[in-house]
Amino acid sequence: MSKIVFFCIPAYGHTNPTLGVVRELTARGHEVRYYSYEPMRTLIEAAGAQFVACDPYDCEQHLTPADGARVGKDIAFSTHILVETTLALDEMVCADMRAYAPDCIVADSMAVWGKAVAKKLGIPFISSTTTFAFNRYSAKVMKQSGSQMLKMLLAMPKINHDLQRLRDRGYPIKNILDIIQNDDQTDTIVYTSPEFQPCADTFSDKYAFVGPSIRPATENIEKVHDVLIYISMGTVNNDLLPFYRTCIAAFADSPYQVILSTGEQIDRSALGTLPDNITALPHVDQIAVLQKADVFLSHCGMNSASESLYFGVPLVLFPQTNEQGGVAARVAELGAGLKLEKADAASIRTAVDAVLQTPSYRANAQNIRESFLRCGGAKAAVDKILSVADRK
């Protein structure tokens, strides 16, 4: 039996892909300890891991799912939060790791405290990457905006100051690249396929492209029309009442069944009286819906796009951040989705109709699905973890 430790930030998009891996590890009889934050406790414990709360030690940060979603998008904010969190958890985590003596640490690419502790204590380490893998080649494809680059340059003095604080505590961090990317010698699990990953052939064999880790559906969705349209803007930045109203207007007179997931921030009454063909809910079982859907109008978070493509469902792409824009661009490049250029009712209806009426979108989504299935999923991820653990 191996002892495996996971570290993650409190973001659903970073936590959910690891849960199938945890289930597979525990099913094989291995022991899993998972360090995260209270909002994630129920999900993690349900997967079979021993949950360890970081909240009592990281008391000044009070990291929330919204903070977790922001990490990785704002480099100065990310660096400060991650350094503060690493230092806050330093004593507790290092003491725990010395006492527990895990065979391997698996840390989210943004949970740099896991990577830093593994380096500090010489514990075998794997990076868990829930976005596209990042190197100098893929960076050219997933370009940042000019304003983002300027913001990063202006923030460099503060970033360097924060990194020095880590070095002062014994962490072998050379520069910002040690935080935001892995080198070709770092064992890395990436939850996509080589076919979907930009510039996949530029990564070393230390990178295991295992495909999405998809949990089982927990509900059964009834499809009552020939065509089912699913609309969701994710779990964090989804306070988009005007957009939801526009979607309702776009499909009010359509022959389509529409399921609209609004998130918890929207007052259902603010949507008005819904047509019979449209259902609006604060939360739905996305996996269950995608198994029946014909088109997904999505913000293009990596998880949502991957789940859609896993079931061969083409997308209408409406990204809200630069990171989501990178995912949307890749889906469009591979012909599995169409970008929504304007968010008015006519444009929404036209885009959805175009995807439905053009067979190549579904065919290309099916091709990506098949590439995911070839990767091995959670079983392949566990094989990678155990191969690294065996080096101890």
Annotated model-derived regions:
Residues 1-33, 39-50, 95-99, 104-107, ...:
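Nucleotide-activated sugar donor-binding and catalytic core shared by glycosyltransferases
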Residues 2-3, 30-229, 233-256:
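Nucleotide-sugar-dependent glycosyltransferase catalytic domains
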Residues 8, 192, 232, 261-262:
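Ser/Thr-centric signal marking residues that sit
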Residues 9, 207, 230, 259, ...:
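Short glycine- and Lys/Arg-enriched binding-loop motifs that mark or flank ligand-binding interfaces
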Residues 10, 57, 131-132, 264-265, ...:
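Short glycine-enriched loops at secondary-structure junctions
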Residues 204, 215-217, 267, 275, ...:
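Generic structural signal for alpha-helix starts
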Residues 208, 216, 231, 266, ...:
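Residue-level signal for pocket-adjacent positions within structured domains
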Residues 235, 245-279:
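Catalytic donor nucleotide-activated moiety binding site of glycosyltransferases and closely related
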